[in-house]
Amino acid sequence: MTTKQICFADRCFNFAFGEHVLESVESYIPRDEFDQYIMISDSGVPDSIVHYAAEYFGKLAPVHILRFQGGEEYKTLSTVTNLQERAIALGANRRTAIVAVGGGLTGNVAGVAAGMMFRGIALIHVPTTFLAASDSVLSIKQAVNLTSGKNLVGFYYPPRFVFADTRILSESPPRQVKAGMCELVKNMLILENDNKEFTEDDLNSANVYSPKQLETFINFCISAKMSVLSEDIYEKKKGLIFEYGHTIGHAIELAEQGGITHGEAIAVGMIYAAKIANRMNLMPEHDVSAHYWLLNKIGALQDIPLKSDPDSIFHYLIHDNKRGYIKLDEDNLGMILLSGVGKPAMYNQTLLTPVRKTLIKEVIREGL
């Protein structure tokens, strides 16, 4: 088991990860810290995991479990409000902690709920997917969707604790693990990775890994993200690099209406971003090939069931949540691009490069 102190400027919290880490929550949280725990989880999280978490938090204070319907279409303010009303009915107060047990969907919904209640009560993350454990909990961004796009309403709110049980993560369906591995590969592509404790040979297309391997991967992702975000807590400057692949990826994810995972969408988004950078003479061909090679190592580009047409993808693309960071005319869209593996492309001292919409459409129409 590993414990890391994660700091966003002066906002610090402990992140404990490893096998059976939930059985050790008593050693991290003082018994009198909270008077009750409101455990929030979406319907896609197995009951066995939720009750397993509740068993150990229940040794500290009473636990109430609130479930909501899973799916991106339920990642909304109305879902948040419903959960808050139910929490208040259970006696939630300023000494209540919200415990998010689930993936990124649950983490964001619970994060927004916690940040708004009583102008902010304690938030604890228990990520149950490798994607959440290695990516979304390593950020203080909390947001929900509008009908026009992903993560358009939200704020910055740090958790008090994070507990990731790698035994639970290792027993996840391979496709779910692959979703997180796509974000790990993103970190390998966007940053120089001289100190990682694994090699490309440790990656596999079956996406079956031991708890110890996943612990190593999480440790790498923590180092990668905090090397940047410790100084850019709002992810508006250097931290924008972690949005690589997300401009087109989020649009694909929305257009597919739940048909593909977030990781699969980001994998496709990174390939399209690499091809766009190559067409703009920013990225050499061999670095585009490196994208394909790494993503194929984890089987990310195999059998992705893409069904949406380019026009529907572009409909969501123009509502990307990074709009407004730089001034653009109506013919261009800002994108995070690379000039090579580990080399973010810069434009006027920012990480957002204007890209002609016609070029984006052209690359999307070509496909993978």
UniProtKB/Swiss-Prot annotation:
Pfam families, sorted: DHQ_synthase, DHQS_C
Binding site for Co(2+): 183, 246, 262
SUPFAM superfamilies (alphabetical): Dehydroquinate synthase-like
UniProt-listed Enzyme Commission number(s): 4.2.3.124
CDD domains per the UniProt record, alphabetical: DOIS
Catalytic-site annotation from UniProt: 141, 243
Molecular function in Gene Ontology: 3-dehydroquinate synthase activity; metal ion binding
Cofactor binding annotation: Binds 1 Co(2+) ion per subunit.
Alphabetically ordered keywords of this record: Antibiotic biosynthesis, Cobalt, Lyase, Metal-binding, NAD
Temperature notes for this entry: Optimum temperature is 46 degrees Celsius.
InterPro entries associated with the record: Dehydroquinate_synthase, DHQ_synth_fam, DHQS/DOIS_N, DHQS_C
Positions of NAD(+) binding: 42, 72-75, 104-108, 128-129, 139-141, 150-151, 176
Family classification: Belongs to the sugar phosphate cyclases superfamily. DOI synthase family.
Protein name: 2-deoxy-scyllo-inosose synthase
